[in-house]
Amino acid sequence: MKIGIINTKIRTVFSAFACMIAASLVCTMPARAVVEININKGVIEPLPIAITDFLSADQLGSNITSVIAADLERSGLFAPIDKGAFIEKISNPDAAPRFEDWKVINAQALVTGRITKQPDGRLKAEFHLWDTFGGQQMIGQQFFTTPDNWRRVAHIIADAIYERLTGDKGYFDTRVVFVDESGPAQKRVKRLAIMDQDGANVRFISDGRALSLTPRFSPNRQEVTYMSFEGGSPKVYLLQLETGQRELVGNFPGMTIAPRFSPDGQKVVMSLLQDDGSANIYTMDLRNRTTTRLTSSQAIDTGASYSPDGSQIVFTSDRGGRPQLYVMGADGSNPRRISMGDGSYSTPVWSPRGDLIAFTKQSQGQFSIGVMKTDGSGERLLTSGFHNEGPTWAPNGRVLMFFRKAAGAGGPKLFTIDLTGRNERQIQTPNFASDPAWSPLLE
C-alpha cells in the first residue's frame, strides 16, 4: 500500500513564505493575525477553538470534523469548544462568520468547512481558519482526494491549523510502525503492524510466524528495517511497504541488534554480538553492502541513533560499568559519555530538531522516559512507572511515543507524551503493542 496517497499538490501562502503540503489547494491569507500559541513557554494554556461540522450531504463532513478536533485536542495545545455552545449556525463556510457570536463563547479561532463529491468521484474538501478576535481569515484551502483517503485529509487540515497557530510543523499526517503482541504471555505472537499516528487503520505487515522486533522507518517512508528471528537466528531485513517485498540486509554470524537508518537512508547502523560476548556498533552501506565497524570495546554497545544531520551517533554502552549514553562521530571517532545521573540509560534517540536526545532510564525500581540536551545537560524525566521504554519522536520533535507495561498488566500499551510531561495519552491498538517508531510527515 502506497504511503504517499494524496498525490496532487497543495500550496498554502503564509504572509511572507510558501509551504508545500500533499494535496491540491486554493488559498488566500491576509497578514498574520494576533492569535497564536507560544509553544516555547513552560506552561501552555490550551487555545479555545471552535470547529464546526463540515457541511456535506452525508456523515463524512462530521467524521472529518471529529478527526480534526481529536488531533488538535490530543496535542494538548488546543481546547475544542463543545458544539452545544455554538451560537451561529454556519450555512456558508466561505463567508465571514459573525465574529461577535464566537467571541461571546471565547472561541479565539474558528474552523469552518465543506465536503462535496465531484463528478469524477473524488471528494473536494474546503476549510477556513478564522481569527475571531482579529476579525479575519487566517487560512483558506481546498483539497481533492479519493473518498477512502478522507482521514488523511482531516490530518492534513489539522496539521495546517497546528502550523499556522504555533509556527511549528504538525505531526498528524504520519504513521507509526510497531510490534503487535497477541496471545498468552507464554506463547506471545509478535508481528509487525503499521497504523496512523492516532491508532486508526492498523495493518499487519508480518505474519507472526517468526519473532519480529525493532521496526524502524526509512527517511523516505517507503521502507522499514527490522530484526527477525526467522530460521532461529536474528537477521536484519528491509521491507518495502508498498509492495510487501523484503530483502536480507546481512546474514551475520552473531546476533544483530537494533537496526536503524541513517538520515540520508543510505546506511543502516546496528549492533553485532561478538564471539567474546561483547557487542559493537557497525554500519552497512545499503548501496554496496559493505560494513564498517565503529566501536571496538569489550562492552555491550547498542541502541545507536544518528543526529539529524548524520554527523554524530548516540548509543548505549556499559563500558563504564552500567549502561550509559555516549555520543561519537558518525565514523566512530571521539566517543564521550553524556549521561551523568544515577541509574542506567538505554534506547537513546536523537530529536528531529537536533536539540534533544530522548532515552529510557532505570533507577530505584522505576523505568522513566526522559530527555536531555545533546551534551548531557538539562536532563528531565517526563514520565515514570513500573516499565516505560522505547521512546520515538514525532517528526516535529515536540511529542514522544513510547510503550508501557503497568504492574500486573498482561502486556504493554502505547502512549504519547509532550515535552512538558503533562500531556500523556494512550493510543488504542487492537492488542498489546510495543516498540513504536514514528514516520516522517507523509507526502
Curated annotation (Swiss-Prot):
SUPFAM superfamilies: TolB, N-terminal domain, Tricorn protease N-terminal domain. Part of the Tol-Pal system, which plays a role in outer membrane invagination during cell division and is important for maintaining outer membrane integrity. InterPro entries: 6-blade_b-propeller_TolB-like (IPR011042), PD40 (IPR011659), Tol-Pal_TolB (IPR014167), TolB_N (IPR007195). Keywords: Cell cycle, Cell division, Periplasm, Signal. Belongs to the TolB family. It is found in: Periplasm. The Tol-Pal system is composed of five core proteins: the inner membrane proteins TolA, TolQ and TolR, the periplasmic protein TolB and the outer membrane protein Pal. They form a network linking the inner and outer membranes and the peptidoglycan layer. This is Tol-Pal system protein TolB. Residues 1-33 form the signal peptide. HAMAP family: TolB (MF_00671). Pfam families: PD40, TolB_N. One of its GO terms (cellular component) is periplasmic space. The keyword Cell division applies. GO terms for biological process: cell division; protein import.
